[in-house]
Amino acid sequence: MTTVPVKAPIEELPTIHAVTNDELLLRPGFLRKAMGIMSVLGDKGAIHIRSQLLDSPTLYGLTLALLELNEQTKCWCIVNDRVDIALACGAQGVQLTHKSIAVPDVQAIAPALRIGASVHSPDEARDAEQAGADWCVAGHVFETPSHPGVPRRESSFINDVVAAVSFPVIAIGGIRPEHVRSLVHRGAHGVAAIRGIWNDENPELAASRYLSQV
């Protein structure tokens, strides 16, 4: 009889999520910077490996390299969208978007894999929780270059999402260190950032600024 893996109870979800993109992943010295950020954040942090352009072998190799750093730092590695890469590499989780395969389908393929869902409204957050996701990343909260022309929702958006669900909510979108404490007071479990960490002259120091506000 085949034994089906069972998802372990989720330990404390990291509070600071350093999200990447293709431009960041292809920068010279990316792994060196990632090591510094992961060392600062430790088990309170997660690196999100998010790519739309890298071929599968490259993304697989990069994810494995980051998971080697996870062994030293305990900082999580979460793969965006690519369930196959997350499962093959043994990542701590996968982050799904509205373009990804559905949460129940991921659970059928990989019952032990932790699942996050990217949402843009309280209703989407509620649907994600009911589908079986372990957390949601909700945004965007403030103006961000990745969504030009889209009005900011402000911190009250997080109040509405938190009120709709019982699982952890991670706020994303134009979030700077000085926003973190207010968002946590509004019920967010933590925050996600891209430019605020990776584009800083000292990414390690930037990561520590975010962490100090939780």
Positions of predicted regions on the chain:
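Conserved N-terminal beta1-alpha1 strand-loop-helix module at the mouth
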Residues: M1-D134, V150-R153, D160, S166-F167, ...
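Phosphate-binding beta-alpha-beta segment of Rossmann-like dinucleotide-binding domains, i.e.
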Residues: A138, E143-G149
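Short acidic/polar capping segments at secondary-structure boundaries
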Residues: F142-E143, I175-P177
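C-terminal binding/interaction regions
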Residues: R186
